[in-house]
């Protein structure tokens, strides 16, 4: 990322010193440690003051952990479940049964790809109606077996293709919103990267909604907003700022319940540390939600979303 050029220079110097020390068999550990300290200080200063559009760039970083990465980090005994039982399986959404610290969960999330082949297979994390219907099937299964649900949101948006529209994209998302509001089991949703519009909401009606520190959640991308609203693609930074899409902005206006700290320099630099923080937040939230009677749990979830956007003088 362009705004990290100073960090990249320091990391390049660190790698050069490591290589030189190995080749010449000399001890340069003190010099390397000093450079690492400089890098860490520079990272903290930079990431404490990112602009909204810089956070958008971090949320899209190609090395940022995806749903299956977090599943590998925080769960055991994961069994993936496939298909919507109506038409086909959509690999842009993955889900299944797992354990987190010995506790049974149903876990569901958007999945992007890393290689070009994987990106095409996963449709860049943009789900078709079949993906949302698969998710709904898993929600209902979790309710039937009294399993808490954990969802990961990471999509630029629902797939807008002609076939998706023919198969009822709008209906599939709308039905998920309706059904999730009444599912009789605890639901925790976490935005781990991009939270793009209705495509994100299809997995986002939950008792507790959290965002990773450098994730974003918005009705439209900054690029789309700049093109449609300002008729100027160069105004993406202004659009990002006006959309209030960062975790910090959304926490202030009450649209999310909390922010999960990422590793220094973003989740892509410390995926295991970020996953550890995420796991602790999930377990704490679920333990709290399970203390509520089911009817009260559902009523509070419904009221939580009904209150969003209400204007009080």
UniProtKB/Swiss-Prot annotation:
Residues 34-288 form the CoA carboxyltransferase C-terminal domain. It holds the Pfam family ACCA. Keywords: ATP-binding, Cytoplasm, Fatty acid biosynthesis, Fatty acid metabolism, Lipid biosynthesis, Lipid metabolism, Nucleotide-binding, Transferase. Its main location: cytoplasm. One of its GO terms (molecular function) is ATP binding. InterPro entries: Acetyl_CoA_COase_a_su, ClpP/crotonase-like_dom_sf, COA_CT_C. GO terms for biological process: fatty acid biosynthetic process; malonyl-CoA biosynthetic process. Its EC number is 2.1.3.15. GO terms for cellular component: acetyl-CoA carboxylase complex. Signal peptide: none annotated. It comes from the Bacteria. It is an enzyme of class 2 (transferase). Belongs to the AccA family. Component of the acetyl coenzyme A carboxylase (ACC) complex. First, biotin carboxylase catalyzes the carboxylation of biotin on its carrier protein (BCCP) and then the CO(2) group is transferred by the carboxyltransferase to acetyl-CoA to form malonyl-CoA. Acetyl-CoA carboxylase is a heterohexamer composed of biotin carboxyl carrier protein (AccB), biotin carboxylase (AccC) and two subunits each of ACCase subunit alpha (AccA) and ACCase subunit beta (AccD). This is Acetyl-coenzyme A carboxylase carboxyl transferase subunit alpha. It comes from Fusobacterium nucleatum subsp. nucleatum (strain ATCC 25586 / DSM 15643 / BCRC 10681 / CIP 101130 / JCM 8532 / KCTC 2640 / LMG 13131 / VPI 4355).
């Amino acid at each position: 990322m362009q705004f990290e050029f100073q960090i990249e220079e320091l990391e390049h110097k660190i790698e050069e010193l490591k290589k030189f020390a190995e080749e010449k068999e000399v001890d340069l550990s003190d010099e390397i440690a000093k450079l690492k300290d400089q890098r860490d200080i520079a990272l903290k200063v930079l990431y404490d003051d990112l602009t909204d559009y810089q956070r958008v760039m971090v949320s899209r970083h190609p090395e940022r952990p995806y749903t299956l990465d977090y599943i590998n980090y925080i769960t055991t005994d994961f069994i993936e479940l496939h298909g919507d039982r109506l038409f086909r399986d959509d690999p842009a959404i993955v889900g299944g049964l797992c354990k987190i610290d010995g506790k049974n969960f149903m876990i569901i999330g958007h999945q992007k790809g890393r290689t070009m082949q994987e990106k095409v297979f996963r449709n860049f994390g943009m789900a078709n109606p079949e993906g949302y219907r698969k998710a709904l099937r898993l929600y209902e299964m979790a309710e039937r077996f009294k399993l808490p649900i954990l969802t990961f949101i990471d999509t630029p948006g629902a797939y807008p293709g002609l076939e998706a529209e023919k198969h009822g994209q709008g209906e599939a998302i709308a039905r998920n919103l309706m059904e999730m509001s009444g599912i009789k089991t605890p639901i925790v949703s976490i935005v781990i990267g991009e939270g793009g519009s209705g495509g994100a909401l299809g997995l986002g009606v939950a008792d507790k909604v959290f965002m990773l520190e450098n994730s974003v959640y918005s009705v439209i991308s900054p690029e789309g907003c700049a093109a449609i609203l300002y008729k100027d693609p160069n105004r993406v930074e202004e659009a990002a700022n006006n959309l209030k899409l960062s975790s910090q902005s959304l926490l202030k206006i009450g649209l999310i319940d909390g922010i999960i700290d990422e590793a220094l320099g973003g989740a892509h630099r410390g995926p295991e540390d970020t996953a550890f923080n995420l796991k602790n937040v999930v377990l704490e939230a679920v333990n709290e939600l399970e203390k509520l009677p089911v009817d009260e749990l559902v009523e509070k979830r419904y009221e939580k979303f009904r209150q969003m956007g209400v204007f009080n003088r």
